[in-house]
Amino acid sequence: MTEDQLLGPRAHGEPCGSAVLKAVAEDFQVEEVLDIPLSGEGEHLWLWVEKRNLNTEEAAKRIARAAGVPLKLISYAGLKDRQALTRQWFSLHLPGKADPDLAAAEDDSLRLLQRVRHQRKLQRGAHSANGFRLRLTDLHADHAQLDARLERIRAQGVPNYFGLQRFGYEGGNLLGARDFAARAELPVQRNLRSRLLSAGRSYLFNRVLAQRVADGSWAEARVGDLLAFTDSRSFFPAAEAECSDPRLAILDLHPTGPLWGEGGSPAGAEIQALEDAVAASEEPIANWLAQAGMKHERRILRLPIGGLSWHYPGPDILQLEFVLPTGCFATAMVRELVSLAGQTDI
C-alpha cells in the first residue's frame, strides 16, 4: 500500500524537493522528555539508556537477561524507533535487591547513561513529549522555499497523521488487521493483537483526517467538533462560541478525530456523520475494534511543532530540531517538506 493510501493528502502543498532520512542512525535522534523528579531511593532502579538501531522491546529483553529478572519487571514509557539513535528511560523492580551488574546488556547498540533509584515504576505514557533532531541528507530543494515552508509549519502545524511505521512494511499490519476483522477473530499472541488493533484504529483515524485535510477543515473548529488541548486526553464539544476560541489560533486547542472503539462517535451531528461514514466504509475493522473492547477515544487532528529550529550544515543537508507530543510522528512533519524517495519504511 502507498503512503497516500495509508496517510492522506498534504496540507501545505507539494513537497519542496526530495531528501534521504536515516542514511545512518544518527540522522534520526529521539530523546524522551520526562518531567518526573527521581528521589534517588526506592525499590525501582531507573535507567537512562541510549540505543542505536535497537528497538525498545529488544532493549528491555537485554536488560532483563543481564539483571537476571523476568521481563515483566522491566517497564518503559513508550516505544521508540529501531532505525535511529534514541534515549529513553527504563525501570526495573528490584525489591530488597542491590543494583545488578548490567555490563552484559551493553555494547555498541546499547549504553547505560544513568542509574537512579525511585519509589515507583515507570508507567506507560509517563513521558510528556519527545525531542527530535533529524538530519536530511542528499537534499534536492531550494533553501528559500524550504525556509518559507518551515515558517508556515511553525505557525500552522501539520496534519497529525499516524506514520507509515504504524502500518508495517507495505501496510502489512493493516492487511493483517483486515484479515482478522473479516473473520471476526483476534490474534492469540498478545503483541501481534496489539499491533494489528493499533494499525486498524490508526487507519480509520487517518481516513477521517484525510477528509478534513481535503476540505480544509483539519485546523479549524466546526460546530459539533470535539476539541482538545495539545497535551490532554479529555475533550469538550464545540458550539458556535468555541469555534472562534483564540486558543485555536495559537495552536493550544485543536479539533479531534476518532480512535475507534465501542460506542461510536460522540461528536455533533455533522462531524459524527463524517466519522460514521468512514467507519461504514471499513465496517469490518470498526466492528472488530469494538469487539476487541477498545474504548472510543480522541486524537488531535492538528500537530503543533514545538521549538522548531533548522539550519543547513551543508548545501545538501538540512538539520531540524523540534519537540512533539507523545504518540505523534516526526515523519508527519517531514512529508510536508520533502519527499523521501524510495524510503517506504520510514
Curated annotation (Swiss-Prot):
- EC? 5.4.99.27
The biological processes this protein is annotated with in GO are: tRNA pseudouridine synthesis
Indicate the enzyme's highest-level EC class. isomerase
Q: Which residues form the TRUD domain?
A: 157-303
Keyword tRNA processing found: yes
> Cellular component GO terms, alphabetically?
cytosol
Is the keyword Secreted assigned to this protein?
no
Which residues constitute the catalytic centre?
81
User: Reaction catalysed by this chain?
Assistant: uridine(13) in tRNA = pseudouridine(13) in tRNA
Any GO MF annotation of the entry: RNA binding
Short name of any one Pfam family annotated for the protein: TruD
The UniProt entry, under HAMAP family, shows: TruD
**The protein's role, per its UniProt record:** Responsible for synthesis of pseudouridine from uracil-13 in transfer RNAs.
Q: Which family does it belong to?
A: Belongs to the pseudouridine synthase TruD family.
What name does UniProt use for this protein? Answer: tRNA pseudouridine synthase D
Gene encoding the protein: truD
